[in-house]
Amino acid sequence: MLLLSSLSRAGKSFDFEFHDEEYLLPRQHGGGRAYVPKQVTVDTPVPLVVFLHGVNRRNRLHMWLGAGPADLRARLDTWIARGDLPPAVLAAPSQTRDALWPAALWSGIDLDEFVAAAERAVAGRARISHDQVIVAGHSGAGCNLEGGILKIAAARGAIQPIGIVALDTCLDAEVGRALAQARDSTRIAAYWQSVMWSRKVVDFAVGFGLVRQEYPPGSDWFEHVSPKGRWPHDALVAPSLLQAMSVLLGPIATPDDVDSEAAASADASLVQ
């Protein structure tokens, strides 16, 4: 059910129900939000970026799409306006119930179901290209083996994401094996910082490599980053997401073909 739409920056946000009884606290509703930039027209199908937030200590709706550390809607507007990315829709569910523990985040989430809900919300304003769906998860969204990006990686639904992006998530052997279960044509990217969170990245890479057969070889990538900002765990999100989207939505490429330093510098003024 579409609940409301609102102007945000240069585009428009559409809020909708998505498993509200399961994911939200009582009296909260409309946990889904889809953002359509002004450059998107209904005439041409566009990519969809699905963003799964991490631990939600303040029980906020729409983290990263209007609440929380930063507003990715504003980032997307900037990236499209300066020609870094093609027009795209950004959509995200919200979880406030049991949202303090990474192991409980996004249990049972179904990508096909969420994409369908987002499509209904933006009907008449945008069309989604099912061949250009990217899923990104921050922090605890990549820790639950039965949920979040790890469940989506193992799923074999109708929507086959072109990329799954782990943004400073859990990184150990189990997570590596879980992400490696993605379809061969789904590219996997992992970004992490070590200022605030030390992880067994070698174990992650080994676990991933034991399961994964890349197609084509070398199409997945893992990158240690040094984000600018007072809180590196959050400051990592925007520049890393931009780099990943640039790689995934461009011609077949590797991150070396994308100037990540330039992207990070351009976004430094936007980091809160």
Set out the residue ranges of the language-model regions.
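Active-site machinery of serine-nucleophile hydrolases
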Residues: 48, 52-119
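A domain-start/cap signature at the N-terminus of enzymes
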Residues: 1-48, 56, 88, 207-213, ...
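Gly/Ser-rich "nucleophile elbow"/oxyanion-hole loop immediately N-terminal to the catalytic nucleophile
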Residues: 40, 44, 102-140
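Primarily recognizes the serine-hydrolase "nucleophile elbow" in alpha/beta-hydrolase
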Residues: 130-184
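Cell-envelope and extracellular/periplasmic
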Residues: 51-62, 123, 138, 150, ...
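Structural recognition of the beta-strand scaffold that forms the well-ordered cores
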Residues: 48-52, 89-93, 132-137, 163-167, ...
